[in-house]
Swiss-Prot record:
GO MF terms held by the record: rRNA binding; structural constituent of ribosome
GO CC terms, sorted: chloroplast; ribonucleoprotein complex; ribosome
Alphabetized PANTHER family for the sequence: 40S RIBOSOMAL PROTEIN S15A
Entry protein name: Small ribosomal subunit protein uS8c
Domain of life: Eukaryota
């Protein structure tokens, strides 16, 4: 685990999703708690609980695995997560320049002056901020 807790969170979720794991355990910080709450609200995660070991808190998230049925059979959908603004290169945007991820099917998570929120909420409130990640 490095200093970039957002990248650690996204990588843990991505790896657990690729390996078909049911749960993910990440270190609990204010920013990771807010991002996980957004993922829970948007339906990418089924449940979240806070777990304490010694003096450290962890978030244990249960992933949602969706299965789709086609003519060729059943296949499992994957959750794609991409870190945009990172410690070496910060990406900021105003509310007019907030990108629509996958034509509005995905979400962008922004850190604004009013807290961490999705791209839709930021457009409604007409505020910009730092683009943290894309999820689709």
């Amino acid at each position: 685990m490095g200093k970039d807790t957002i990248a650690d969170l996204l990588t843990s979720i991505r790896n657990a999703d690729m390996n078909k794991k049911g749960t993910v355990r990440v270190v609990s910080t204010n920013i990771t708690e807010n991002i996980v709450k957004i993922l829970l609200r948007e339906g990418f995660i089924e449940s979240v609980r806070k777990h304490q070991e010694r003096n450290r808190y962890f978030l244990v998230s249960t992933l949602r695995h969706q299965k789709r049925k086609t003519r060729k059979g059943i296949y499992r959908t994957r959750t794609f997560l991409k870190r945009i603004s990172r410690p070496g290169l910060r990406i900021y945007t105003n509310y007019q320049g907030i990108p629509k991820v996958l034509g509005g099917m995905g979400i962008a998570i922004l850190s604004t002056s009013r807290g961490i929120m999705t791209d839709r909420e930021a457009r409604l409130n007409r505020i910009g901020g730092e683009v943290l990640c894309y999820i689709w």
